[in-house]
């Protein structure tokens, strides 16, 4: 997918739209940190697109105030069925629950962590699959890089009682706390580093991140995962698959791999 070329810039989301009466064109809107240099980004992205044999007709930039930015991408985020009969609903969207499905409501000022991304869905699927054989009253589920707390809320829906989320970003930790509270879920949310700020262990660990933090964190995660526990990792894109595999194979046994679009999600256990 074209949008995967921009992932390291577009922390705040990418919108892909068709161009009216021009079926061979698509319009991509990327929301990047305004502190970044536009000319550098433009040059870098044009080079990436050229290398991928994708032609560019024009590149424009605008500085948006916060309210305009929020409205720009929020209108595109729709309720999604992340698991059978479990709906993730953005707080700003309506949902006609005619089939009486369970609803988790997520409020967020970032587009990632609203349930629409392939990696979130595949993590949720593996979480459901591997938690079914566990004692849900005893198991601890640790979500590394918890973001909005969405996977913790899915874990709570599945019946897991002891939930811990950790994120290095204060705004993310605060957002996770708010979403847990709004959905009446009890969870410990830590703002800090895995190695120094989480002193316990867990039978089930989630890490929906990207390749760079996974390379650093995989050895640390091994110390936090109990024997016979399950680690679910995602955020591994096709282009960096070969790069991460030595880090996985060094100390982990691959139980299962799921692929959604260009993204890979793994269920692992310690060797």
Kindly label every feature range from the protein language model.
Residues 110, 114-198:
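Conserved SAM/SAH cofactor-binding pocket of Class I
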């Amino acid at each position: 997918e074209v949008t995967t070329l921009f992932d390291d810039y577009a922390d705040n989301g990418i919108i892909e739209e068709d161009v009216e009466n021009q079926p061979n064109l698509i319009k991509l809107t990327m929301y990047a940190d305004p502190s970044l240099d536009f000319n550098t980004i433009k040059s870098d992205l044009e080079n990436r697109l050229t290398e991928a044999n994708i032609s560019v007709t024009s590149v424009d930039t605008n500085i948006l105030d916060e309210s305009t930015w929020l409205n720009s991408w929020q209108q595109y985020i729709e309720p999604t069925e992340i698991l059978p009969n479990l709906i993730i609903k953005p707080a700003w969207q309506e949902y006609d629950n005619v089939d009486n499905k369970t609803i988790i409501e997520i409020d967020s000022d970032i587009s990632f962590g609203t349930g629409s991304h392939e990696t979130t869905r595949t993590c949720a699927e593996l979480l459901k699959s591997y938690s079914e054989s566990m004692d849900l009253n005893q198991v601890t589920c640790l979500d590394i890089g918890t973001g909005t707390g969405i996977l913790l809320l899915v874990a709570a829906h599945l019946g897991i009682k002891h939930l811990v989320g950790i994120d290095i970003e204060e705004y993310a930790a605060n957002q996770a706390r708010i979403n847990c509270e709004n959905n009446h879920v009890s969870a410990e949310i830590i703002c800090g580093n895995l190695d120094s700020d989480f002193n316990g262990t867990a039978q089930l660990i989630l890490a929906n991140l990207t390749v760079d933090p996974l390379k650093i964190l995989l050895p640390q995660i091994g110390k936090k995962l109990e024997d016979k526990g399950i680690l679910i990792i995602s955020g591994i894109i096709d282009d960096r698959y070969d790069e991460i595999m030595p880090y996985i194979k060094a100390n982990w046994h691959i139980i299962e791999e799921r692929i959604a679009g260009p993204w890979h999600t793994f269920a692992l256990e310690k060797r």
